[in-house]
Amino acid sequence: MALCAALAGCGPDKTTEDGSTQESPSAVPGPSSAPEAAASPEPSARPAPSPPFVAADTASALPAMALPPRDDCAGQPGWAEFRARLAAAVATRDAQALADLSARDVTLDYGGGHGPASLRKQLSAPSGAAIWADLARIMPLGCAIDGQMATMPWFFAHLPETVDPGMTMLVTGSGVPLRARPSDTAPEVARLDWALVSLAPGFNPAARYAAVITGRPQRKGWVAMDSLRSLLARRILAEQTGDGWRIAAVIAGD
């Protein structure tokens, strides 16, 4: 797969809704929906609070599928050594070591930023701490392989083509609670396993919880932000070259 295709997440091996790469739905069976307010309350009764969703939120149902991490790169020649060096650089936050693993034209953003020197500068700046933290979160999320191109995390290379990446997140774990309200003590609507969820309007990335809608069967609720990852979050692309594996891109967005 060409680097441009990998950056866009549009490779030929996308997972499709028919379950060609997954066999089980993403959520543990639970109640079919969050409690609904009474249709015709008595005049003297206090109306039940309206949930933060509107009908338009559910217009496009996500496929019922799970995207747990897989390592499809492990068997590639030279990958084990490359990944070990990558993991060590991330664990020690060694900007020079990461730059040494990078291609001469490593892509850093969609505005023309590139090169090992620029990568080293980004990682060494005060704002680099957030990049290092995100790279550490990527490492356990698997690796996809397509020809001579590797993609971390794995799920980025296996997204259904029908998914809107700007409005969808991945639940990063098994048994993650989908709650009726944005509270650690709120009742559980369901438990989710590496599921894709749609964001409801009013998303606030600084909040502790996000209002989401699951794939079929559709359920509405709240998931803790620390258990969600944007489909457009940072990823690492590596390419096999004559000099071994090299980081081709460290990039976020689309």
Regions found by a protein language model. Give the residues of each.
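Short, low-complexity N-terminal intrinsically disordered segments enriched in polar/charged residues
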Residues: 48-88, 100
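Sec-dependent bacterial lipoprotein signal peptides
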Residues: 1-8
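Boundary regions of SH3-family modules and the immediately adjacent low-complexity/disordered segments
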Residues: 128-170, 213-254
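Short, well-ordered alpha-helical segments enriched in acidic and aromatic residues
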Residues: 94-105
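Bacterial signal peptide processing site
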Residues: 10-14
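SH3/SH3-like beta-barrel superfamily modules
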Residues: 188-227
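Post-signal peptide N-terminal segment of mature Sec-exported envelope proteins
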Residues: 17-59
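Short, charge-rich amphipathic alpha-helical segments embedded
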Residues: 106-121
